[in-house]
């Protein structure tokens, strides 16, 4: 068996180096960690939504085109809600005027819209009067307030946009033009300024509730979600690790050695990412939590085997060397398979998910390296003593479980298959659904603002629709005006619609004004020259910062409409987008239409990401299966392991259909993410099973041997992994929370499958006797088998 001998010699050699030159190995690895960690100074944080999309993303390119053609729409909306439920009071209207004036002082502000400075138009003799709806020169008398209320609640531009239908909530919308030199810092600067303003007004108006909404608020929510995770989840994970390690290892010094390895793994990984020029995001900020979890599993195998060997009379040095010899290949194989799973995330359409996969894969391999170099050196130098025997109850439980599986294999196999089939049938009940607002938990300030706005005014989901005539001054053509008029009416008839901001309403109002405010003329002008003159007259009357550049391009060849809808899921939003394109294809194919928005971008990426992830699944399976076949030197065992490796994800997603039924961007990567991890259990179980078979044992005896030698270690590492991903499930950011929750479910199911389903397959399809090891090898294996009670 030259292959297996080579593997074991590598492990033995590595173990001897780490024990013979322990101080040198310790210093060398710590030096490497320090050099890597220095790269952390280059790390910076990005919290804007752009990081989720490639520069070549179709929807992002469309949105950038709209942003370039028209004024940018990055905004922060201050929602004002007086407790008395009426904004049309002198006190509240005065407050809105003050906020509107102060909002111009917000950093990077380029436009402020509110009912206070809404440019109301009306006929004045034979002229057009354009002035602020809450003109500062007018006293807020009951008559004036009544007129303002009547206009605000009837004007399509304002109703369900800047003021609620009931008149109990209003919005001051601040548009900002960020330089985008350091978008994260700029967003923080804007939000800090707004917070200071709100705090000031909150003290002066204690009976008024304020909320922050809009794109800038969403970007800030991404930032705070990541910061909250890093400040809460990582410390929580450390506590969880300390608790579980103390319970499992019953040795403070062993716990300290493990902590040094996992902290070193995290520091080195994040430092290397800094050297590579990467940045932190809401996705990658949780990489340390994953690395800690996976590194603990490696350390547990090494320490548990060493301690069991010491209990059987070997010296500490011998025990460390034996532990590395027995664990090196399983740890290497499981680390590589886990890394492959993470690396397959490079097929994701989202850059931050690719970064998450690459960093996690790097962290896994760093942890693998340190667990077979730094860890044994630490174990050699620390005065570790074994005092307690492993619980006999736990030993007996695994033996009894092995006996149960062997005796009940005829029932367990069809039962397992039935569970897999039933869960597979539930998978179609899952729907891909990304709703960016719901990425944040109910306690999140932005989520609360979004829910409040949807309940009282309108949803925060919008679609910018650019309509191009491809003709200078073409927007004044009667055919075009009639088209956008009909399209606007069609949009308002859609069940999802909350508000439509359209130039058609401006034209209708101007046409009425120019005919003495006669309601009979509230319609679109039908003469091109007249329409152009109306618009020119109106634009010349508008004050600085309140022009129509956010709706009309420079040469007046295209317009932008903004559709605001309820906070829809991705499926409904994409369906609405398709209906928009279909309307133009049927009614106005001569015009070019581009629709996009951040919400629409998130809606599309969830679907495309799931498709790309599913397309990588066969590649991942082939790579991992090939690795297993190579490691085990058995095509039969490699093929047998395929179903138990796929089953956990199948069962997990089937159960998810009952738990939630929604697949978001985070869950779209769970299959490839967990596949590499769930293979670990199969590798350890199969390696022990194969060892026994090569000693001449039957399949049934080998299954019992595998349970006896590796059962407890698999249980321990699964508990640690499930605990780690469960901590991730505590994230305030739903993408991370759902990913953690489903991953924890899949990993736990993997243990159940490897305990109940894999053994039954082995006993059914692996009955043929193995070529036995030569006597010398057999004796060596028997001698070493006594120390593998807890190793994996």
Regions found by a protein language model. Name each.
Residues 2-47, 377, 385, 389-436, ...:
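Signature of alpha-helical transmembrane segments and their immediate interfacial
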Residues 408-530:
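Juxtamembrane segments of multi-pass membrane proteins
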């Amino acid at each position: 068996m030259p292959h297996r001998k080579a593997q074991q010699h590598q492990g033995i050699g590595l173990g001897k180096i780490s024990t013979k030159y322990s101080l040198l190995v310790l210093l060398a690895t710590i030096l490497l960690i320090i050099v890597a960690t220095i790269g952390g100074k280059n790390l910076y944080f990005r919290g804007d939504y752009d990081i989720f999309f490639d520069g070549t993303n179709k929807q992002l390119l469309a949105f950038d085109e709209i942003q370039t053609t028209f004024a940018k729409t990055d905004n922060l909306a201050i929602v004002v809600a007086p407790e008395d439920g009426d904004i049309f009071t002198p006190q509240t209207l005065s407050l809105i005027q003050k906020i509107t004036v102060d909002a111009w002082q917000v950093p990077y502000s380029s436009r402020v819209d509110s009912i206070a400075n809404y440019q109301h138009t009306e006929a004045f003799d034979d002229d057009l009067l354009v002035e602020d709806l809450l003109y500062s020169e007018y006293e807020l008398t009951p008559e004036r307030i009544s007129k303002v209320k009547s206009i605000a609640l009837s004007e399509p531009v304002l109703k369900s946009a800047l003021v609620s239908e009931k008149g109990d909530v209003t919005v001051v919308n601040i548009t900002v033009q960020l330089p985008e030199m350091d978008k994260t810092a700029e967003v923080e600067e804007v939000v800090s300024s707004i917070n200071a303003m709100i705090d000031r007004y909150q003290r002066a108006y204690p009976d008024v509730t304020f909320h922050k909404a809009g794109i800038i608020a969403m970007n800030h929510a991404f930032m705070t979600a990541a910061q909250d995770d890093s400040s809460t989840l990582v410390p929580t994970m450390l506590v969880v690790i300390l608790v579980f390690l103390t319970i499992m290892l019953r040795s403070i010094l062993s716990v300290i050695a493990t902590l040094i390895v996992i902290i070193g793994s995290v520091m080195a990984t994040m430092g290397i990412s800094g050297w590579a020029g990467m940045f932190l995001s809401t996705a990658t900020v949780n990489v340390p939590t994953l690395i800690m979890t996976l590194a603990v599993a490696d350390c547990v195998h090494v320490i548990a085997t060493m301690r069991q060997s010491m209990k059987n009379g070997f010296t500490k040095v011998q025990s460390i060397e034996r532990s590395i010899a027995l664990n090196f290949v399983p740890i290497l194989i499981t680390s590589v398979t886990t890394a492959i799973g993470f690396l397959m995330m490079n097929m994701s359409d989202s850059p931050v998910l690719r970064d998450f996969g690459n960093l996690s894969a790097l962290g896994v391999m760093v942890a693998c390296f340190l667990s077979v170099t730094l860890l044994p050196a630490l174990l050699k130098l620390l005065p570790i003593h074994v005092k307690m025997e492993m619980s006999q109850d736990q030993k007996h439980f695994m033996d009894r479980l092995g006996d149960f599986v062997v005796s009940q294999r005829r029932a367990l196999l069809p039962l397992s298959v039935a569970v897999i089939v039933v869960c597979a049938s539930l998978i179609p009940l899952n729907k891909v659904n990304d709703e960016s607002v719901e990425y944040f938990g109910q306690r999140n300030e932005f989520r609360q603002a979004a829910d409040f706005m949807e309940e009282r005014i309108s949803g925060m989901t919008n679609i910018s629709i650019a309509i191009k005539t491809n003709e200078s001054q073409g927007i004044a053509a009667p055919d075009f005006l009639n088209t956008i008029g009909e399209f606007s009416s069609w949009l308002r008839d859609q069940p999802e619609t909350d508000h439509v901001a359209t130039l058609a309403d401006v034209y209708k109002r101007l046409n009425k004004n120019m005919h003495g405010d006669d309601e009979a003329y509230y319609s679109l002008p039908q003469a091109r020259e007249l329409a152009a003159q109306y618009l020119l007259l109106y634009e010349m009357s508008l004050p600085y910062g309140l022009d129509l550049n956010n709706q009309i391009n420079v040469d007046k060849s295209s317009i932008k409409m903004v559709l605001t809808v309820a906070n829809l899921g991705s499926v409904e939003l994409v369906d609405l987008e398709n209906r928009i394109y279909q309307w133009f294809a049927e009614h106005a194919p001569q015009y070019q239409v581009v629709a996009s928005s951040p919400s629409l971008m998130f809606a599309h990426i969830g679907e495309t990401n799931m498709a790309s992830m599913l397309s990588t699944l066969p590649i991942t399976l082939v790579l991992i299966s090939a690795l297993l076949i190579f490691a085990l030197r058995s095509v039969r065992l490699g093929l047998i392991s395929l179903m138990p490796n796929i089953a956990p994800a199948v069962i997990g997603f089937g159960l998810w259909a009952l738990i939630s039924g929604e697949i978001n961007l985070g869950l779209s990567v769970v299959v490839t993410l967990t596949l590499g991890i769930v293979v670990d259990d199969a590798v350890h179980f199969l390696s022990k099973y194969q060892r026994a078979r090569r000693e001449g044992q039957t399949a049934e005896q080998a299954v019992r041997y595998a349970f006896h030698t590796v059962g407890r270690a698999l249980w321990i590492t699964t508990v640690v992994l499930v605990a780690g991903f469960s901590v991730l499930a505590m994230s305030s950011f739903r993408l991370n929370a759902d990913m953690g929750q489903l991953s924890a479910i899949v990993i736990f199911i993997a243990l159940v499958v490897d305990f109940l389903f894999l053994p039954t397959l082995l006993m059914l399809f692996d009955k043929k006797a193995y070529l036995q090891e030569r006597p010398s090898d057999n004796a060596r294996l028997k001698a070493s088998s006594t120390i593998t009670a807890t190793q994996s």
